[in-house]
Amino acid sequence: MQTPKNKLVIIPTYNEIENVERIIRAVSGLEGGYHILIIDDGSPDGTAAVVKSLQPEFEDRLFLIERSGKLGLGTAYITGFKWALDKGYDYVFEMDADFSHDPADLPRLLAACEDGGADFAIGSRYADGVSVVNWPIGRIIMSYYASVYTRTVLRTKIMDSTAGFLCYSRRVLEGIKIGRA
């Protein structure tokens, strides 16, 4: 039986007022009790206010870290990873707020780690053809060919190296020694 704090989805935001409530509801609606950590980089559009208004409804499952200014995606994930480790989560997910990743695929990523024995799983927008929403064609082409290039140069089987849709086991995050030189 899984512990209640088993799974955390980290969703960095900046000006995601149009998406943030929908993504929270989509992730919260999944079976398995996924917790959500929104890390907002001082969105001037009120993204953080929307999250705060939803916290009473999703008590003990929806968390918010507000940062002042646009500090970037990488530092948002590092902040989230540290928070997740401090709170005792076993599996930590990266996910965008703009629905470029389907929340319904979170259980598949989890299964790769939890049931499949992987310490790290990457979701792909290209494994079964292109699956992105509201992206300009230039961004789709650039992302696709960046992944092809990465597969070729590094000789890996990673289908979507720019996905940003990942699941990490606690063991991997602890091994990385996040935030240490």
Regions found by a protein language model. Give the residues of each.
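Acceptor/aglycone-binding surface of glycosyltransferases and processive sugar-polymer synthases
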Residues: 67-86, 91, 103-180
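Short, acidic, metal-binding catalytic loop of nucleotide-sugar glycosyltransferases
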Residues: 25-34
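Acidic helix N-cap motif at the loop->helix transition within catalytic regions
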Residues: 18-22, 45-54
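A conserved acidic beta->alpha catalytic loop
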Residues: 40-49, 99
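Short beta-strand/loop segment that forms part of the nucleotide-sugar
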Residues: 33-43, 65-66, 95
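N-proximal low-complexity "stem/linker" segments adjacent to membrane-targeting elements
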Residues: 1-26
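Short, conserved active-site loop motifs that form the nucleotide-linked donor/cofactor pocket
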Residues: 7, 34, 61-63
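Residue-level signature of catalytic and energy-coupling elements of molecular machines
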Residues: 20, 27, 80, 98, ...
